[in-house]
């Protein structure tokens, strides 16, 4: 029974993002609530919301976060590598699972993170991009930093 419930929740999430992808394809920005911890510590699932803007085919800078579909699932992760025909993404809360997509498979660009306290983070500026790439390059110690972050901030917020 719990397995069915888990599948149902994932299906709803996928439908939710599919609707957002349709709006982005029509040229409309979307604001979404996000779930999951794959973008910790920068995006806290279940608390933060994000605004995505349509992708217009421009070359994306390293460090930007984008919405795309990979293996049938919608993701919002950070661009960490690129070549002539592909983008390679990795969630900030992940250590080693890269998602590779064709450049034209990007659906939207993360523009703003809306935090519960009313603060907003611009995710297209130089500071965000550089901070994200620094975070990417310290992968060997990220596991420990994420463990501390979860213990200090996520458990105390419950």
Predicted regions and their residues:
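Extended hydrophobic leader/signal-anchor segments used for secretion and membrane insertion
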Residues: 1-158
């Amino acid at each position: 029974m719990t397995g069915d419930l888990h599948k149902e929740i994932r299906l709803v999430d996928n439908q939710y993002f599919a609707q957002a992808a349709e709006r982005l394809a029509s040229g409309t920005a979307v604001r979404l609530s996000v779930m999951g911890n794959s973008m910790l510590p920068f995006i806290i699932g279940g608390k933060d919301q994000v605004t995505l803007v349509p992708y217009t085919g421009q070359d994306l800078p390293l460090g930007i976060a984008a919405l795309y579909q990979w293996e049938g699932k919608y993701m919002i992760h950070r661009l960490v590598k690129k070549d002539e025909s592909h983008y390679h993404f990795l969630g900030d809360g992940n250590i080693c699972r890269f998602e590779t997509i064709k450049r034209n498979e990007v659906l939207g660009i993360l523009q703003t993170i809306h935090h519960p306290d009313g603060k907003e983070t611009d995710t297209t500026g130089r500071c965000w991009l550089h901070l994200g790439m620094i975070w990417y390059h310290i992968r060997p110690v990220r596991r420990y930093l994420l463990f501390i972050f979860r213990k200090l901030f996520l458990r105390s917020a419950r």
